[in-house]
Design a protein with these regions (language model features):
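Charged/polar low-complexity intrinsically disordered segments
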Residues: 5, 13, 29-30
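Short, low-complexity, charge-dense intrinsically disordered segments
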Residues: 23-26, 35, 40, 46
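Active-site rim beta-loop-alpha module in soluble metabolic enzymes
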Residues: 205-238
Length: 313
């Protein structure tokens, strides 16, 4: 091509490849961050390296294998100990509660109406949280506990006790899955939910078929122990750990009230330990509800991806 002499040719500018690459990597990481954050900011498996850079899955990369070993070790030891125990039949004196007063035509009045908080907490959770199966199952179990426990305390016997324990088993299984989702990995928690529910249901059927409560007691005991281990070994992904601690303390208090039913009732003959157990357990469920209502995603400024600003305090 001819170029007139009075028009100087312009040299072609070189593309700054390093700057272009930097901008591309920054925008790609931002896109990956948006893609990697699922419902309510949870890390998905789409971009585990990016999640790790934010500190969301630090425990997975550093502690996954040891914790899996601890988890299955606890599982094996607890189940092994269960086999060594003799069968545990349902003690019929369990149905003889200290407070058996009939008020307004309702037998065992306070043990029945003290289940109303379960209905309120469960309904609030179901109304607010509908996307995660484990969360739905947990609050569904809490809601149904209000119905099943009221039904049982209206006429305490083994048949009605089954419908009291069934929804509690749903909540125990879902609680373990929730903590695995929150502390370890969302996918692992979602997978764990269904076998945990199956084991819980089987434990109740085994009790009704063979009058053996060993597996049911394990279903109550093991999730609490596993949750404690997970809390000790894994970093939280969300704020609000104090709500989990409050829930644990309140549930322990509920079990204490259960074992001191008559002693508490004998003090004033007003409220029994079992009534207080219902209120403390419902308060524990409320603490978990508050956790889900108020939690915020925790980010780690020291390991932020390139191109992303520091999070505001």
């Amino acid at each position: 091509m001819c170029v007139p002499k009075d028009v100087p040719s312009q040299p072609r500018r070189k593309r700054d490849s390093s700057n272009f690459g930097h901008r591309f990597r920054g925008s790609h990481q931002i896109f990956s961050l948006r893609r990697g954050l699922g419902h309510e900011g949870e890390c998905s498996s789409a971009s585990p390296s990016l999640c790790y850079s934010l500190g969301m899955t630090r425990g997975i990369a550093k502690q996954n294998l040891p914790v899996v070993g601890v988890f299955f070790g606890l599982l094996a030891v607890s189940l092994g100990g269960l086999v060594l125990l003799p069968p545990i039949p349902q003690d019929q004196s369990y149905h003889q509660f200290a407070d058996q007063r009939t008020i307004f035509g309702i037998p065992n009045f306070w043990n029945v109406v003290s289940n109303l908080p379960f209905l309120a907490v469960g309904a609030a959770g179901l109304r607010r949280f509908r996307n995660d199966p484990a969360t739905v199952v947990f609050f569904l179990g809490v809601f149904l506990t209000g119905i099943g426990s009221s039904y049982y305390h209206w006429d305490p016997n083994d048949g009605t006790l089954f419908w009291d324990r069934l929804p509690m088993t749903l909540s125990f299984a879902a609680l373990l899955a929730l903590v695995v989702e929150e502390r370890v990995n969302a996918r692992a928690g979602a997978i764990l939910l269904w076998p945990a529910l199956a084991i819980g249901l089987f434990s109740l059927l085994l009790w009704r078929w063979n009058d053996d409560l060993r597996l049911y007691f394990w279903v109550q005991f093991f999730p609490g122990l596993a949750v404690l281990v997970l809390f000790l070994l894994y970093q939280p992904k969300y704020t609000g750990t104090h709500y989990w601690i409050a829930a644990g303390v309140l549930y322990a208090l509920a079990k204490l009230f259960e074992f001191t039913d008559g002693a508490i009732y004998s003090v004033r003959n007003f409220l029994s330990g079992h009534t207080l157990k219902h209120l403390a357990a419902a308060a524990a469920c409320f603490a978990i509800l508050r956790y889900f209502q108020t939690r915020r995603l925790i980010t780690w400024p020291s390991a932020r991806p390139v191109g992303l600003p520091l999070p505001k305090a």
